[in-house]
Amino acid sequence: MKYKLDLPALPVLPALLLAIVLTACAAACANKPPEDPKDYVSTIAAWRAARDADFKSGSNSPVPENRRAELLPLGYFPIDPEYKTAATLKPSDDTAVIPFATSTGTVRQMRRAGALEFTLKGQPLKLTAFVEVGAPNNDRLFMPFNDLTSGTETYPGGRYLDLERNVTGIYEIDFNRAYFPYCYYSPTYECPYPPAENRLKIPVRAGERFKTENSKLKT
């Protein structure tokens, strides 16, 4: 026997008001002024300064005390708003566990969350986002990558980006926030290496970089 679920009809006036509010919100979002480049530069500069302060005196600093004078403040490429770009996540149906080699010789287990497709300086590109098997926070998307600066201007073991998973599938990738794995500062950290699929065939001159040519030798 089938049952029919009767739901009360939404009154006309509240429904009309709801439609008006949603339309107004959509219009406001569409007409939102673009971010002022000066504000963006200030935001990234403040984020970098906060990292330096935390790494210098924070109780959980990854930089050993005997290397702080050498490494701090951290080295960065100049802030470039063109390295912040919109990306679309194409979810992955692949549930296979992928072993990631690490800096300590161990293996970390990852799964593909999907491919982030974007355009950077006019060139279409793609990076795979991963989630770690057994991680307490599956909302964190992990994007380790190499590019043509790896090993010369940046750490040979790649750089990292993180994103918080959302329901829209639309993200902002900001390479000005790309950072070195902690094993660059201290070999006590275990850092996964980027997989072959995340090796960009362009130089990404944004985010963290070596301070001097000698810094890359002390990994």
Annotate each PLM feature.
Residues T43-L116:
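N-terminal secretory signal peptides
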Residues A24-A28:
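C-terminal motif of bacterial Sec signal peptides marking the signal peptidase cleavage site
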Residues P91-G157:
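Mid-length scaffold segments of soluble, non-membrane domains
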Residues K32-A45:
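Short, low-complexity, disordered segments immediately C-terminal to signal peptides
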Residues P144-Y179:
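Acidic, glycine-rich flexible loop segments
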Residues N31-P34, G151-E153, I170, R177-T219:
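Extended, aromatic/histidine-rich regions of cofactor-dependent oxidoreductases associated
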Residues Y83, T95-P99, N166, E197, ...:
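Terminal leader/tail segments of proteins
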Residues K2-A15, A19-I20, T212-T219:
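Short, basic, low-complexity termini and linkers enriched in Ser/Thr/Gly/Pro
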